[in-house]
UniProtKB/Swiss-Prot annotation:
InterPro entries: P-loop_NTPase, Thymidylate_kin-like_dom, Thymidylate_kinase. GO terms for molecular function: ATP binding; dTMP kinase activity; nucleoside diphosphate kinase activity. This is Thymidylate kinase. It comes from Variola virus (isolate Human/India/Ind3/1967) (VARV). The keyword Nucleotide-binding applies. Keywords: ATP-binding, Early protein, Kinase, Nucleotide biosynthesis, Nucleotide-binding, Transferase. ATP binds at residues 11-18. Induction: Expressed in the early phase of the viral replicative cycle.
């Protein structure tokens, strides 16, 4: 039995990650594909993260970074097991979000990556670009929904993409019409599922 693929969607807030994940789930109807999003707000760490994001509680940046990281590690074994059982996971945000947001607040990229080192490695990371319209919509109730901060996050994403580090990035332009974007992403995901080989890798090892 071939293993499943770990396919991650990344991008700024309101870039359409969840929409595209749901498009994939609807357009590839199969019992071998599951959706997972981060942060998972139902866990102990997730509830603390939710309180922070919704401004109910405050923590220093180092604690916040570790909470987000721990939230992903809570699901590392689950992800590994699902992939080995032939289940493809469509993941809405992953370690790259953690690093981009942490470094946008001034954390060391090397240190931030070290916290995530060893997590199951994605077979494909789809980065959804945001046009100026989408970026300017980033004003909301949650703590990171701020235009200036999102611009900083974008620069950190660009650094990771440029560095590469054996990560298969696929950048989707914000210029595409929605129906074209949907079809393009579906084809990219199908190809990734059909071509995945070898054991599950470890991220940043």
């Amino acid at each position: 039995m071939s293993r499943g693929a770990l396919i991650v969607f990344e991008g700024l807030d309101k870039s359409g990650k969840t929409t595209q994940c749901m498009n994939i789930m609807e357009s590839i109807p199969t019992n071998t594909i599951k959706y997972l999003n981060f942060p998972q707000r139902s866990t102990v760490t997730g509830k603390m993260i939710d309180d922070y994001l919704t401004r109910k509680k405050t923590y220093n940046d180092h604690i916040v970074n570790l909470l987000f990281c721990a939230n992903r590690w809570e699901f590392a074994s689950f992800i590994q097991e699902q992939l080995e059982q032939g289940i493809t996971l469509i993941v809405d945000r992953y370690a790259f979000s953690g690093v981009a947001y942490a470094t946008a607040k001034g954390a060391s990229m090397t240190l931030s990556k070290s916290y995530e080192s060893g997590l199951p490695k994605p077979d494909l990371v789809i980065f959804l670009e945001s046009g100026s319209k989408e970026i300017n919509r980033n004003v909301g109730e949650e703590i990171y929904e701020d235009v200036a901060f999102q611009q900083k996050v974008l620069q950190e994403y660009k650094k990771m993409i440029e560095e590469g580090e054996d990560i298969h990035w696929q950048i989707i332009s914000s210029e595409f019409e929605e129906d074209v974007k949907k079809e393009l992403i579906k084809n990219i995901v199908i190809e990734a599922i059909h071509t995945v080989t070898g054991p599950v890798g470890q991220l940043w090892m």
